[in-house]
Amino acid sequence: MRISKVAGYILISILVISFSVTSIYVFYQQGNKDSKEKFFFGVSYGQNTVEDAKIIIDKVKNYTNLFIINSFPISTNNTDSEVLNEICDYAAKSDLYFIVYFFSFLQRIGDWQQEWVIDAKQNWGEKFLGVYLRDEPGGRQFEEGDVIKNASSYSEATENFVSTISTSFSMDFLKKKCIPVFTSDFVLYYYDYLSGYDTVFAEFGWNNSRIRQVGLCRGASKMLKKDWGAIITWTYTQPPYLGSGTEIYADMITAYDAGAKYVVMFDYEKENQKGILTEEHFLAMEKFWEYVSSNSNKEKIKAQVAYILPNYYGWGMRHPDDKIWGIWDADEKSSIIWENLNKLETKYGLLLDIIYDDPQYDIKESYDQTFVWNATIN
């Protein structure tokens, strides 16, 4: 009888433990599934204090679900995580998901950042989406030669760019800890993904073609089975800095309708506590959130046509004389590609992806129609 009771208690204990483990597994699987399927919209916060962060969060929390803490002083200069923790707590309590910018995880930069990231998922659960690692890796290569100074060929430049970033201490650290890695950029999206980034935000700013930015970033993410988004950023170097409310609303709609998983409004420290965002921009954001809520079941625009660039051809494509890998001047292929891109963008708009002739991917299976870079296009 005693043996039967003991066996019964053991059986009950096993069932309870099994149920608990299963429940925890299902909870995290459901959380991951939910964030996988969600659309995220929010602000990239570029200021430096808890007070200012709370002001922005209170302003936008009813029509956003994402907050990016994009502040070098908060995540790198501070000697401890107190400020960052308070902002993350406030964002999570406001029912916002959040991403945190870090410049590096080397101990010489700081001694708390590594531990903070390791503990973040436990502290905030699914609200912590990942790390925004540095900024504009492709753009910095073009403007500063940040990754590679010299190379003998386009293929060598590609290999050096990808290997330098992918094997860096910070990228390696995040990958080993299974932390999703984000960045934003305006060139070389495909090579950002190859370097280890899980999500890249295409920068909608200046006079850059939105169709081209979408085609390059969405096309790269599709080839590599990654996520993509758009960040609405600088239009001017002086006030008002950003486009009008009407202009940024149009950019948000373009990104959302084209299938972006993330749409972000860039903000930056300036004279007032709300940075460069004005009431006009907040009204446009609220209007966009209403559009998203009303069109959540609307089928997104999927690319049907692909324009195939030569492999390793890291041309900026912002203007006809743009650099290649930030090292070489435009070559004989550049003018052909420029002309063809203009024709295809006019004809197909957001139905166009711009991808690379990488032999490891079956490109033709993914699109109804493809054009190689030097095709004759009428």
What label would you give each PLM region?
Residues 1-18, 22-27:
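N-terminal Sec-pathway targeting helices
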